[in-house]
């Protein structure tokens, strides 16, 4: 799990006087110290990371966020901004006793402009709620992810979440037009703009996109809200090899072109897990036991009456024809196109809910990497080989890869390695499921191997989930020391006392390391 947690920094300890100051700012109800509130905000979605915050603060306005941070900065109290707490790298929960700043009360959609195709909302707006508000105006959010029912737009911006439709909408670095951010000393940066063009010096908002709460608290977001399609089609194709999955992607880019919204893949192990774990999940192509599956989503706009536009029926015919042509040319073994919205959503769920199935199965080691598309699945194969080699090197089914056998042995026969992800973006989700729990021995087989292998391909050790508490010490696999040092200097500009989300993203300086030894 990324080794031992970083030692507690030299931050102040929360006192009754601090709680009284917070109550003054927020009112009694929004300063939570009860066990239920603290349990929920101290533990992450995977139940892998757990902190020990003594208070959860729930502001409703930017001015309150500003007053809280002013107080914390003056006192030297550490703070973790928390959105929907669906992050997968332990970034949104405390490592030690940091104060949790929950954004859920700041959830208003402030303005929607259907002509410009823009929306402004508060950071605590749940992505699915925003989607519904936009759908009512014929618009859609520029991102979609499996956690949409819980994650917040401020969390999405702060992690630079990618998700399922990046193929169509691009990254949030392009879709976000403006932000309001409160920096560590309580300063409010009003960078909220809905302009498409604004070349007035440094584009400061970009620094906060993907900063994971280490530079400031995002309080408002302005972003593009594209037109909602009048119809979508989902197809699942079974393919005989990963190379065929890549060939199907290449083909889709030319044949489905502008309509393509998503191009995802999963392997057989992922499908088996979903089928055995999630109620109602059905094999999309029960006659074929393929090693890989690709999922496409295509969109149609308009009602077919305008020049060059097609009806949804015609668009679906086009997708069916594409699937048929893949089969005819031997790229796909079989394929199915969703017959209606219910069928389409059942097909999507097979891909979208793999993480939920993994959570049901027990402990899981997650790696979220960017790699050259053709080589993406090699990492899954290499990981399986490595696991098998260490298992056969062991005398029994229990294996130990580290010094203390008693604490590191695990039953390798229960461990499974899954590969799935956003094929259209070159983003692999390598997941190693260990139903019996986390084991240092298993971790030693996986790390630093996965990071080193990724670095050798000049990939990224975090494609979309971020660095959080999991990977600060691995950052050097994806960034050189000069770049990491530049990041530290940026941190010092916005948060000189280092109170915002300490222990996350940035690795400690070597000198800091040494002084602690
Ligand atoms: P949190 O988990 O609460 O926080 C995440 C980070 O952002 C933390 O560092 C936190 O401190 C910071 N933060 C949160 N809010 C603010 C704020 N207002 N200001 C400053 N910092 C803030 N991720 C993807 O990229 N693509 C996917 O397809 C995807 N699918 C997922 C599917 C499931 C089932 C789950 C559980 C997770 C998935 N994720 C995915 C990961 C996660 O949902 C995203 O990282 C999401 O953007 C996190 O949003 P959140 O509101 O839950 O943030
Ligand atoms: C997805 O694409 C998410 O489903 C989660 O990014 C991936 O759980 C994971 O590893
Ligand atoms: Zn993903």
Label the model's feature ranges:
Residues 1-517:
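Noncatalytic alpha-helical scaffold of FAD-dependent oxidoreductases
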């Amino acid at each position: 799990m990324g080794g031992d947690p970083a030692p507690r920094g030299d931050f102040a300890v929360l006192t009754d006087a601090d709680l009284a100051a917070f109550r003054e700012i927020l009112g009694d109800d929004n300063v939570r110290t009860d066990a239920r509130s603290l349990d929920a905000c101290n533990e992450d979605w995977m139940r892998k990371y757990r902190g020990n915050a003594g208070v959860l603060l729930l502001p409703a306005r930017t001015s309150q966020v500003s007053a809280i941070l002013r107080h914390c900065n003056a006192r030297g109290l550490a703070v973790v901004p928390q959105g929907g707490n669906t992050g997968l790298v332990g970034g949104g929960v405390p490592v030690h006793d940091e104060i949790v700043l929950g954004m859920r009360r700041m959830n208003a959609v402030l303005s929607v402009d259907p002509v410009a195709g823009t929306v402004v909302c508060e950071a605590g707006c749940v992505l699915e709620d925003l989607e519904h508000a936009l759908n009512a105006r014929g618009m859609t959010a520029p991102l979609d992810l499996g956690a949409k029912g819980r994650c917040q737009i401020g969390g999405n911006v702060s992690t630079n979440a990618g998700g399922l439709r990046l193929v169509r909408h691009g990254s949030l670095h392009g879709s976000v037009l403006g932000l309001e951010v409160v920096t560590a000393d309580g300063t409010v940066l009003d960078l909220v703009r809905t302009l498409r063009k604004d070349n007035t010096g440094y584009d400061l908002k970009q620094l906060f996109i993907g900063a994971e709460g280490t530079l400031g608290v995002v309080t408002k977001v302005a972003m593009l809200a594209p037109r909602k399609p009048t119809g979508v089609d989902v197809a699942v194709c079974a393919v005989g090899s990963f190379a065929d999955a890549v060939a199907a992607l290449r083909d889709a880019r030319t044949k489905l072109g502008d309509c393509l919204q998503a191009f995802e893949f999963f392997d057989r192990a992922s499908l088996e897990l979903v089928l055995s774990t999630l109620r109602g999940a059905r094999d999309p192509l029960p006659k074929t036991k393929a090693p890989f599956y690709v999922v496409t989503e295509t969109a149609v706009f308009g009602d077919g009456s305008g020049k060059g536009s097609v009806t949804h029926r015609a668009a679906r015919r086009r997708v069916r024809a594409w699937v048929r042509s893949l089969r005819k040319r031997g790229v796909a073994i079989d394929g199915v196109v969703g017959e209606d919205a219910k069928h389409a959503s059942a097909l999507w769920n097979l891909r979208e809910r793999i993480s939920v199935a993994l959570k049901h199965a027990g402990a899981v080691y997650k790696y979220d990497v960017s790699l050259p598309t053709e080589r993406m699945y090699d990492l899954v194969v290499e990981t399986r080989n490595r696991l098998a080699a260490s298992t056969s090197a062991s005398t029994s089914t229990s294996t130990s890869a580290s010094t203390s056998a008693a604490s590191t042995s695990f039953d390798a026969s229960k461990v499974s390695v899954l590969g799935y992800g956003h094929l259209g973006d070159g983003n692999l989700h390598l997941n190693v499921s260990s139903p019996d729990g986390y084991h240092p021995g298993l971790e030693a087989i996986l790390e630093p191997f996965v990071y080193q292998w990724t670095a050798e391909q000049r990939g990224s050790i975090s494609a979309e989930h971020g660095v959080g508490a999991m990977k600060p010490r691995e950052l050097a696999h994806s960034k050189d020391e000069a770049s990491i040092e530049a990041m530290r200097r940026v941190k010092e500009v916005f948060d000189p006392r280092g109170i915002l989300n300490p222990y996350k993203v940035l690795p400690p300086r070597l000198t800091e390391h040494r002084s602690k030894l």
